[in-house]
C-alpha cells in the first residue's frame, strides 16, 4: 500500500518435483511482459527459503515457512523492497500494479492461502516426473543415474505423496496431467488478464484521498489485520493515535477466544485505560480497517473519541452509518465525525479472504471448498456516512 492506486497480485503455482511449474512460470512471464508492459511482473522460487545446508530439498522441514509468510505479507502491503533468505533482494515499483508469480512445492499450506490472489496446482503423474527428473539431472546435469533414481524413490516421491499432493485440494485451478503446455498457458494467461482487469478497475474507482499521515496510521492497522488473517482470525485491526503518537492498538480475538465481544477497538481501549486517563480520548483519533459495530461505536461515543477513520462499511452491524448512526446521536454524549474509505478495497478483500476459507471455530462450521474469492469491488457509497 505504498501507493493507494497500486495493487499487488500474488499467484501461487504449486506442484511436485519436475511437474513443470518453472517452465509454466517462465512462459507466463514472457506473455505478461508482452501483453501488459505497464504491469510489473516477477518470479520468486520457494527454494530461496531453504534453510542453509539443507540436505533434503523435498522435505517441508527444509523450508523457512515463517520467513516466506513475512515476505508474502510485505508484498501484500505494497513494500518497495523485499529481501529473501538466500541473500537476494527485489525492488518493487510503487507506480505500477504488480503480479508476483511464486513457484514451489509447499505453497498451498493452509496458513499461506490468504496471501494469494490465485492458487494453481500443476499436476503430473509419477512416471512423467521421473522421466523429467532423469532427463534433467542425468542427461543435462551429468548426474549419477543410480543416485538420481534413489533420490526420487526415497525422497522426492514420498514427500510428494505424503505432503505435497494433499495440498492440491486448496488450489483454485488444477492443471491436469499430460495437458499440452500451450493449452495450459492460454488458460492461465487469460486468468491473469482477468485479474489485471479487476486490479485496474478497483484501483481507478475505489480510491478515497486522505492526507499521507492518515494513510500511515491505517497501514499499521492493515499490517495487523493481515497477520490476523494468516492466523485464521477475523481480519479487523485498529490503532489509536493521540497527538501524533500511537497509544494503543488491537485486533479481533473473537475466533481465538470464542467470545463475540473481543473486538479490536474494545481490546485496544482496555490497554489504553491501563496507562492513560479516559480524558485522553477527547484528543485521540481511531484508525480501524472496518466500520465499528454498534457496540464499539457506542463505546467510542461514551469516551468522547475525537474522530474515526475506517476502510470499508459493516453492512450487518455497522454503528457509524451502515446500519445505525450512533456517532451522530447527540442526545447523551457528543457526536464524532467518521471518515470512510481509507484503503477501502484492501479492507474489503481482507474480509472476503477470511470468509472464503474454512472456519472450524464458527458456531456452525460450513464447508467452503467450492467458494470462489470474488475480486470485483463495487464503489463505496459515501452518502450514508454523511
Swiss-Prot record:
Its cofactor is Zn(2+). This is tRNA-specific adenosine deaminase subunit tad2. It catalyses: adenosine(34) in tRNA + H2O + H(+) = inosine(34) in tRNA + NH4(+). InterPro entries: APOBEC/CMP_deaminase_Zn-bd, CMP_dCMP_dom, Cytidine_deaminase-like, P-loop_NTPase, PRK/URK. One of its GO terms (molecular function) is kinase activity. Residues 212-322 form the CMP/dCMP-type deaminase domain. Keywords: Hydrolase, Metal-binding, tRNA processing, Zinc. The gene is tad2. The active site is at residue 265. GO terms for cellular component: cytoplasm; nucleus; tRNA-specific adenosine-34 deaminase complex. Belongs to the cytidine and deoxycytidylate deaminase family. ADAT2 subfamily. Its EC number is 3.5.4.33. Disulfide bonds: none annotated. GO terms for biological process: nucleobase-containing compound metabolic process; tRNA wobble adenosine to inosine editing. Transmembrane segments: none annotated. The keyword Hydrolase applies. It comes from Schizosaccharomyces pombe (strain 972 / ATCC 24843). Structural subunit of tRNA-specific adenosine deaminase, which deaminates adenosine-34 (the first, also called wobble position of the anticodon) to inosine in many tRNAs. Inosine-34 allows the decoding of 3 different nucleotides at the third position of mRNA codons, as inosine is able to pair with U, C, and A. The wobble inosine tRNA modification is essential for cell cycle progression in the G1/S and G2/M transitions in fission yeast. Zn(2+) binds at residues 263, 293, 296. The keyword Secreted does not apply. Heterodimer with Tad3. Pfam families: dCMP_cyt_deam_1, PRK. It comes from the Eukaryota.
Amino acid at each position: 500500500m505504498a501507493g493507494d492506486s497500486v495493487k499487488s497480485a500474488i499467484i501461487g503455482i504449486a506442484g511436485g518435483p519436475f511437474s513443470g511449474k518453472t517452465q509454466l512460470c517462465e512462459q507466463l512471464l514472457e506473455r505478461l511482459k508482452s501483453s501488459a508492459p505497464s504491469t510489473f511482473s516477477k518470479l520468486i522460487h520457494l527454494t530461496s527459503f531453504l534453510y542453509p545446508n539443507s540436505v533434503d530439498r523435498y522435505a517441508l522441514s527444509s523450508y523457512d515457512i515463517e520467513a516466506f509468510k513475512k515476505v508474502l505479507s510485505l508484498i501484500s502491503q505494497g513494500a518497495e523492497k523485499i529481501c529473501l533468505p538466500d541473500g537476494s533482494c527485489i525492488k518493487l515499483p510503487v507506480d505500477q500494479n504488480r503480479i508476483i508469480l511464486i513457484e514451489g512445492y509447499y505453497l498451498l499450506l493452509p496458513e499461506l492461502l490468504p496471501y494469494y490472489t490465485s492458487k494453481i496446482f500443476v499436476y503430473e503423474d509419477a512416471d512423467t516426473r521421473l522421466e523429467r527428473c532423469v532427463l534433467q539431472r542425468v542427461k543435462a546435469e551429468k548426474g549419477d543415474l543410480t543416485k538420481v533414481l534413489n533420490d526420487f524413490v526415497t525422497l522426492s516421491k514420498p514427500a510428494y505423496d505424503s505432503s505435497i499432493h494433499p495440498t492440491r485440494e486448496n488450489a483454485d485451478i488444477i492443471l491436469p496431467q499430460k495437458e499440452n503446455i500451450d493449452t495450459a498457458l492460454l488458460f492461465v494467461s487469460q486468468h491473469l488478464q482477468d485479474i489485471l482487469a479487476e486490479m485496474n478497475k478497483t484501483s481507478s474507482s475505489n480510491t478515497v484521498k486522505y492526507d499521507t499521515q492518515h494513510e500511515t496510521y491505517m497501514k499499521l492497522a492493515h499490517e495487523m489485520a493481515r497477520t490476523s488473517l494468516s492466523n485464521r482470525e477475523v481480519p479487523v485491526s485498529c490503532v489509536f493515535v493521540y497527538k501524533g503518537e500511537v497509544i494503543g492498538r488491537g485486533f479481533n480475538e473473537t475466533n481465538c477466544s470464542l467470545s463475540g465481544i473481543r473486538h479490536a477497538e474494545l481490546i485496544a481501549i482496555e490497554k489504553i485505560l491501563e496507562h492513560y486517563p479516559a480524558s485522553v480520548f477527547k484528543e485521540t483519533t481511531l484508525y480501524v480497517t472496518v466500520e465499528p459495530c454498534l457496540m464499539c461505536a457506542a463505546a467510542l461515543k461514551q469516551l468522547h473519541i475525537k474522530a474515526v477513520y475506517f476502510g470499508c462499511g459493516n453492512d450487518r452491524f455497522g454503528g457509524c452509518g451502515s446500519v445505525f448512526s450512533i456517532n451522530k446521536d447527540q442526545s447523551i454524549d457528543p457526536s464524532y465525525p467518521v471518515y470512510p474509505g481509507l484503503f477501502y478495497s484492501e479492507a474489503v478483500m481482507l474480509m472476503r479472504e477470511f470468509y472464503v476459507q474454512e472456519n472450524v471455530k464458527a458456531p456452525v462450521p460450513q464447508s467452503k471448498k467450492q467458494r470462489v474469492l470474488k475480486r470485483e469491488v463495487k464503489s463505496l457509497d459515501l452518502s450514508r456516512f454523511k
